[in-house]
């Protein structure tokens, strides 16, 4: 089983479909999505519809991004929906639903949004949307840090695990590799790319809204993978 982590999507359905269809994912593999499925891009509704379909075919886990949090809050508070429209590119999302009435959004989409996680952890990695406070245990992290805080000068987390996140757009459209921290927000929704990273090998795949497709390697994960293979072959 391999783990594939998908970065920020922002309504870019063509990018998402292209990257997943060209990545060698099998039914035994695990998919983790780091959040920001909606806003900016042309088809937020289509993205959520597609994710609901994908989770029927694969083992999927979904993190909450700041855009999903704002989406949920906008259903409850008038001031939140005004801010969502004013600063968060909500119009693109509502246009994809073909309505300006938030209550017309399918209940299955609200259920999907309500079930999103704040963090995911396994033996080697911690997955969050935004970032972590380096000296704070995972269970004690503030939700604002996990969902909203920008990645400025990331430091190793006290757990010793590698942190994989999105949220802070990489304007060169390539994943950020700090060794202890990997950011795979490659600016989807602003003429960037959706990134899918295999944590087992360090290989990543990217696609954009023109259905262009490319791949690369995160060197820190690739070195670790090669070292593990060498040890395995020696034994």
Task: For the regions a language model picked out, list residue spans one by one.
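N-terminal active-site segment of His-dependent metallophosphoesterases
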Residues: 1-48
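Beta-strand-turn-beta hairpins that frame and shape the catalytic cleft
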Residues: 1-4, 120-126, 178
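Residue-level marker for buried hydrophobic side chains located in beta-strands
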Residues: 5, 31-33, 62-63, 126, ...
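Divalent metal-coordination and catalytic microenvironments
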Residues: 8, 36, 51, 65-66, ...
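Active-site environment of divalent metal-dependent phosphoester hydrolases
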Residues: 10-14, 39-42, 69-72, 134-135, ...
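Active-site neighborhood of divalent metal-dependent phosphoester bond hydrolases
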Residues: 40-48, 52-118, 149
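His/acidic metal-ligating clusters that form di-metal
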Residues: 105-133, 138-173
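Acidic, His/Gly-rich catalytic cores of divalent-metal-dependent hydrolytic chemistry
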Residues: 155-235
């Amino acid at each position: 089983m391999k783990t594939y982590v998908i970065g920020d999507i922002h309504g870019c359905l063509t990018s998402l479909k292209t990257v997943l269809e060209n990545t060698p994912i099998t039914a035994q593999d695990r998919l983790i999505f780091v959040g920001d499925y909606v806003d900016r891009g042309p088809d937020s509704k289509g993205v959520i519809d597609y994710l609901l379909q994908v989770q029927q075919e694969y083992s999927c886990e979904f993190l909450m991004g700041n855009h999903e949090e704002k989406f949920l809050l906008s259903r409850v508070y008038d001031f939140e929906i005004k801010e969502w429209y004013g600063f968060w590119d909500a119009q693109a999302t509502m246009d994809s639903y073909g309505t300006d009435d938030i209550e017309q959004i399918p209940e299955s989409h609200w259920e999907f949004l309500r079930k999103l996680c704040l963090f995911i952890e396994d033996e080697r990695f911690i997955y969050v949307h935004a970032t972590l406070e380096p000296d704070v245990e995972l269970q004690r992290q503030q939700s604002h840090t996990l969902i909203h805080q920008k990645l400025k000068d990331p430091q190793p987390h006290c757990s010793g695990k590698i942190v994989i996140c999105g949220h802070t757009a990489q304007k060169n459209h390539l994943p950020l590799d700090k060794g202890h921290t990997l950011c795979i927000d490659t600016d989807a929704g602003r003429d960037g790319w959706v990134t899918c990273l295999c944590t087992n090998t360090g290989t990543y795949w990217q696609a954009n809204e023109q259905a262009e497709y490319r791949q690369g390697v995160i060197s820190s994960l690739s070195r670790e993978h090669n070292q593990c293979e060498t040890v395995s072959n020696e034994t």
